[in-house]
């Protein structure tokens, strides 16, 4: 059940009646008509912009449309009142039974309450993390991993068919650096002094890789020139790093469906095929780019190169795909990789990049648009940095990693659930502060604790009621006399339950899972507020000894909140608390 969607359907139906009666011209586009909570709750339960949206195409004053619409809606038994405000906004109040029906729907639908068919089975590929396989994941990867996984869960919950994908960057120079770094640890494992030259990876995490190389090869690689051991060690070390990355992701309960290799694109004709597709579209040419202003990018050279006419699809400048020496630029395999995803039949692509890849957005979007003839949209979500603190002081680096704080550091300090929730307490493109002490505080200022406390309180109510002999199954509670829920504070909490399906759809359309975390904090706040009022007003307590009808209704309300919190935390990948410790 989606009450906001149901009332919107009611509004659209009333507009259709107005068209039939000649009060509005036929064929008006109602796609932008919305029904949402008003900015000020004192104005009503819901508000619609129908009159404001349709006034111009209808050639009428918005207030005239609003008044005619209000008259039709007020006649519906679900609407208590319909009032025109300002130039033509329409505020609606629903009969209390509508909010009570939401509670019953949440109990009947359980974990599926709020689940939507909005996506209609659309196949979406969400590529995220895609960290270079050169070391353990750092805190920036942590935020990207949580964001991507929660976004995938949100899209799944809203009716999409989702693939979680990791692109292994194993085709560039960085994996050669990894191989040389691992080789030095191999020498160390054989009793020699490692030469960790500048530019190599210094972290202790490569020591086990060196030992594993010794176990496999003994001393046989020590006297060989680099060209004889480089490829073998590179593949061995890359596999070891990917095993480490999989373990790191598992600490956060992130599990990929697909791992795609950049290296696999070379020598298979896939890059050539993707570039040829662009060439046939008239988007590949030979030329010399003007030198860019400011910092010179790595792929610019003052010689003729093979260029992609990305400006034809919204980019600022055309982009090199092949250098003058005949080698591919970094961009070429990325084009081929996205062409591969398009060929696999996805209806939409989402890339989750670090904020330092902001310059890549326009060129990649242009490439996908060109490759798919505009059929497959690409949404690039940029993940801003995470600043780490402990009691307000900057958190120190990990010795194991060499230069950075690892995902493992974060999860070991804070736990997976706390880490996941807190990483979603800001929009992805805003910097996030993560204080190891504060995220574990038991206070309203800590959203993780506050939401989990609400979950635990609901569970406590159910346990105590069961101990009093009340049947607390969802099926039994759904039969309660919900007309007993009549206090404004109770109805306000029911309204929040009603907003859940709408929140899911809005968050899914925007690709913004942080909206789920924000909503959970809001509904937890409403529950805590009602709970605290019960300390002074016994009639508002969830447990009403001596009045089984009232108690069943109030427990049903609490349970409906629990259903929503559990579903929301599930999307975020967080386990709902049954009790606070």
Curated annotation (Swiss-Prot):
Any GO MF annotation of the entry: ATP binding
Keywords: Aminoacyl-tRNA synthetase, ATP-binding, Cytoplasm, Ligase, Nucleotide-binding, Protein biosynthesis
Protein biosynthesis among keywords: yes
UniProt-listed Enzyme Commission number(s): 6.1.1.19
Motif segment ('HIGH' region): 131-141
A biological-process GO annotation: arginyl-tRNA aminoacylation
Name of a matching Pfam family: Arg_tRNA_synt_N
EC top class, as a word: ligase
CDD domains the record matches: ArgRS_core
Reaction(s) catalysed by this chain's protein: tRNA(Arg) + L-arginine + ATP = L-arginyl-tRNA(Arg) + AMP + diphosphate
Complexes and interactors: Monomer.
Protein name: Arginine--tRNA ligase
Originating species: Paracoccus denitrificans (strain Pd 1222)
